[in-house]
UniProtKB/Swiss-Prot annotation:
Enzyme nomenclature, EC number: 6.3.2.8
Transmembrane residue ranges: none
Zinc listed as a keyword: no
Domain of life: Bacteria
GO biological process terms held by the UniProt record: cell division; cell wall organization; peptidoglycan biosynthetic process; regulation of cell shape
Protein's UniProt name: UDP-N-acetylmuramate--L-alanine ligase
GO cellular component entries: cytoplasm
Protein location: Cytoplasm
Keyword annotations: ATP-binding, Cell cycle, Cell division, Cell shape, Cell wall biogenesis/degradation, Cytoplasm, Ligase, Nucleotide-binding, Peptidoglycan synthesis
Binding-site positions, ATP: G109, T110, D111, G112, K113, T114, T115
Disulphide bridges, residue numbers: none
Enzymatic reactions: UDP-N-acetyl-alpha-D-muramate + L-alanine + ATP = UDP-N-acetyl-alpha-D-muramoyl-L-alanine + ADP + phosphate + H(+)
Function: Cell wall formation.
Length: 457
């Protein structure tokens, strides 16, 4: 079958495209711009057109799109004119799963689902189960970063931003939490949002939930948490090299967990994975070995650069909700106790910023200094009065040293540079390219670091 993917550079779309390509289908696609994913897919032999155009047409049997692709996209318009079926990516992905009829491990929720999915996949690979993996991020141990084809069960990250996620029926499901992100896709109805999690839970054989989550804890056949749940934490210690935690089951000391990835939130992610595999009757010794070996996912506290002479670090992170940012900064302050923490944050989506408003500033105030950029729209229409300046204003009212830049190239004028500093480039948009430019400029100048201040402090 000949399949055209509109927006093939997206992390979820590229994984599905890879799956169909490696299963013998004639795959090609288009993207609004060149990305690392489009370059990788092209290297494998998948034709990709940039940008979108009605001329990007090879008489496909099927067109796949995401909700981010508008109905007036020229390729979608042409598909309708040519009477070619158009399917949403998530709908098509469900069809793939139904077609293949394999055992399914799924992870959904607001925060931590990519890392938790990666942990599940890593464990199954360690156990020689040969999983097929669809990941919403890049993990070095997967053959194609965000995808790997196997002969065993399917592991996938299930995006709750679309209500259709409730139509899936995995065998096993971890719900990390449910914080009402993307509520605009549920008619701004918390009840409708909750119902979607309830629906998918009814379709699942085993559900693992966070015992301290208000919306979904009751859905779990088994639960995990800090002090509440089937699996809990008795104590935890952490250093730059590793962290350890003592896990209790039903209130009794059960095992010791060791992780190389930092952050208390990752202890909870691993606890969810332990709860899952223990409930399924797996021998936990190799599961714990796999978790200790786990090295994380790209753009999740990824150290992109370190200058030992000046002790300057540059770290990339995908955090884009207030809770994720709070977890990130708590981790940074734990790992880098003696360094200054500077955050360069790019808000993601107008709808999220409007809904969360002051919550971003409350999370960001954990940093020593903050630079806020304008919003990365993620194909949303701009909303009047909604701007990154909202966060800047809130930070100033909290007494935090903060700066605002409207355009990313202006960052170099305002980033406060000094020795013994950790620069965190944070967001789900294109802020990572600013991180790379910052490192390039720093390496090229490599003079004695001096503090640079902008006029919009």
């Amino acid at each position: 079958m000949k399949i055209h993917f509109v927006g093939i550079g997206g992390i979820g779309m590229s994984a599905v495209a890879l799956h169909e390509f490696l299963n013998g289908n004639d795959v090609y696609g288009s993207n609004i711009e060149e990305t690392e994913r489009t370059a990788y897919l092209r290297k494998l032999g998948i034709p990709i057109f940039v940008p979108h155009s009605a001329d990007n047409w090879y008489d496909p049997d099927l067109v796949i799109k995401t909700p981010a692709v508008r109905d007036d996209n020229p390729e979608i318009v042409r598909a309708r004119m040519e009477r070619v079926p158009i399917e949403n990516r998530l709908h098509y992905f469900r069809d793939i799963l139904k077609r293949e009829k394999k055992e399914e491990f799924a992870v959904t929720g607001t925060d931590g689902k990519t890392t938790t999915t990666a942990m599940v996949a890593h464990v199954l690979k360690h156990l020689k189960k040969s999983p097929t993996v669809f990941l919403g991020g890049i993990m070095d141990s997967l053959e194609h970063g965000n995808y790997e084809k196997g002969n065993g069960p399917v592991v996938y990250e299930l995006d709750e931003s679309e209500e259709f996620f409730s139509e899936f029926s995995p065998n096993y499901l971890i719900i990390t939490n449910a914080r009402g992100d993307h509520l605009e896709n549920y008619g701004n109805s918390l009840s409708r949002y909750r119902s979607a999690f309830e629906k998918i839970s009814r379709n699942t054989d085993l559900v693992v939930t966070f015992a301290e989550d208000e919306l979904t804890s009751h859905l779990g056949d088994v639960t995990f948490g800090v002090k509440k749940g089937t699996y809990t934490l008795e104590m935890r210690s952490a250093s730059r090299a590793e962290q350890k935690a003592v896990v209790e089951k039903n209130g009794k000391r059960y095992l010791e967990l060791k992780l190389k990835v930092p952050g208390f939130h990752n202890v909870l992610n691993a606890l969810a994975v332990i709860a899952l595999f223990d409930s399924l009757g797996y021998d936990l010794a190799p599961v714990l070995e796999a978790l200790e070996e786990f090295r994380g996912v790209h753009r999740r506290f990824s150290i992109a650069f370190h200058d030992p002479e000046t002790n300057i670090y540059v770290i990339d992170d995908y955090a884009h909700t207030p809770d994720e940012i709070r977890n990130l900064l708590q981790t940074a302050k734990e790992v880098f106790e003696n360094e200054k923490i500077v955050v360069i944050f790019q808000p993601h989506r107008y709808s999220r910023l409007e809904r969360e408003d002051g919550n971003f500033a409350k999370a960001l105030q954990l940093a020593d200094e903050v630079v806020v950029t304008e919003v990365y729209d993620a194909f949303e229409e701009k909303k009047n009065g909604v701007s990154g300046k909202m966060i800047w204003d809130s930070l100033k009212s909290l007494g935090k040293e903060a700066y605002f830049v409207e355009k990313l190239p202006e960052l170099e004028k305002v980033i406060p540079v000094s020795e013994n500093t950790v620069f965190l480039f944070v967001g789900a948009g294109d802020i990572i390219y600013s991180s790379r430019r910052f490192v390039e400029r720093y390496q090229s100048s490599k003079s004695s670091p001096s503090r640079v201040l902008g006029s919009n402090k």
